[in-house]
């Protein structure tokens, strides 16, 4: 049994902090790797910015619908094992991912730190719109307003409720497991600063991450690690 398995068995309150590497095995590309979403693209950050949404809504809509949605993607073993652990322990998942796969796997306590592509709303009247309808048109049939997905774009702030929920879970956790993220994007990477100092921290990632305090690094493929849990 590896150290992570042992820690998961002993822990009562667990927080998983997940990034793009968790969804890559489900066929959803990450952003910055050589095969990632941004590879070979000019100004992808602009296309996913608040400025683009406001100034060029058609361009924004085309980019998002053609590059961000993977409706046929299914949860992989990482998502499934996390959901399974939640049936026995107090688990909160705080994810940078916007693909809804943790919920699809059956996880109930998920904080979508950067929002979700599957929550959409009209910017004019505020009405919630299904992602299915958004994928057909970004114009709200009821009022003519422009629909957007409820995700955090460049130039936008993380929602206060996402930060509050995350900090509450982090402070209570006796085990924090960072999975599939380089853990460099702020404020996500600052969440562990608010941990209970007795909490153990593990990181499972193909590349080593750095933290300014002790943690246990598993430089490995997360799929292999979670298959053994």
UniProtKB/Swiss-Prot annotation:
One GO cellular component this record assigns the protein to is: cytoplasm
- Enumerate the UniProt keywords alphabetically: Cytoplasm, NAD, Transferase
Q: Which gene encodes it?
A: cobB
User: What are the positions of the active site?
Assistant: 114 (proton acceptor)
Q: Where does nicotinamide bind?
A: 98-99
Main function: NAD-dependent protein deacetylase which modulates the activities of several enzymes which are inactive in their acetylated form.
Q: Does the keyword NAD apply?
A: yes
The record ties this protein, via Pfam families, to:
SIR2 (PF02146)
Which positions does UniProt annotate for NAD(+) binding? Answer: 20, 32, 96, 98-99, 114, 181-182, 205, 223
Q: Where in the cell is it found?
A: Cytoplasm
Its Enzyme Commission number? Answer: 2.3.1.286
| UniProt-listed CDD domains | SIR2H
- UniProt catalytic activity: N(6)-acetyl-L-lysyl-[protein] + NAD(+) + H2O = 2''-O-acetyl-ADP-D-ribose + nicotinamide + L-lysyl-[protein]
Question: Could you tell me which InterPro entries the record lists for this protein?
Answer: DHS-like_NAD/FAD-binding_dom (IPR029035), NAD-dep_sirtuin_deacylases (IPR050134), Sirtuin (IPR003000), Sirtuin_cat_small_dom_sf (IPR026591), Sirtuin_class_U (IPR028628), Ssirtuin_cat_dom (IPR026590)
Organism, as annotated? Listeria monocytogenes serovar 1/2a (strain ATCC BAA-679 / EGD-e)
Q: What is this protein called?
A: NAD-dependent protein deacetylase
Write down the PANTHER family for this protein, in alphabetical order.
NAD-DEPENDENT PROTEIN DEACYLASE, NAD-DEPENDENT PROTEIN DEACYLASE SIRTUIN-5, MITOCHONDRIAL-RELATED
Q: Which residues form the Deacetylase sirtuin-type domain?
A: 1-229
Broadest EC class?
transferase
- Main location, first listed in the record: cytoplasm
Q: Name one GO molecular function term.
A: NAD+ binding
Q: Which Gene3D superfamilies match?
A: SIR2/SIRT2 'Small Domain, TPP-binding domain
């Amino acid at each position: 049994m590896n150290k992570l398995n042992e820690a998961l068995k002993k822990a009562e309150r667990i927080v998983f902090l997940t990034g793009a590497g968790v969804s890559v095995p489900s066929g959803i590309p990450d952003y910055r790797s050589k095969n990632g979403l941004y590879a070979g693209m000019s100004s992808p950050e602009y296309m996913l910015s608040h400025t683009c949404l406001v100034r060029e809504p058609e361009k924004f809509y085309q980019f998002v619908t053609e590059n961000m949605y993977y409706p046929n993607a299914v949860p992989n073993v990482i998502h499934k094992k996390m959901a399974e652990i939640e049936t026995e322990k107090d688990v909160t998942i705080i994810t940078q991912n916007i693909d809804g796969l943790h919920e699809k796997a059956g996880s109930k306590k998920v904080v979508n730190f950067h929002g979700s592509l599957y929550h959409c709303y009209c910017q004019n009247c505020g009405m919630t719109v299904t992602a299915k309808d958004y994928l057909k048109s970004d114009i709200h049939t009821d009022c003519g307003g422009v629909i957007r997905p409820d995700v955090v774009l460049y130039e936008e702030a993380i929602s206060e409720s996402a930060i509050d929920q995350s900090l509450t879970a982090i402070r209570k956790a006796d085990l924090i497991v960072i999975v599939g993220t380089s853990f460099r994007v702020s404020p996500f990477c600052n969440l562990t600063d608010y941990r209970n100092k007795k909490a153990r921290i593990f990181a499972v990632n193909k590349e080593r991450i750095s933290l300014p305090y002790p943690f246990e690094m598993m430089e490995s493929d997360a799929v292999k690690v979670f298959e053994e849990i």
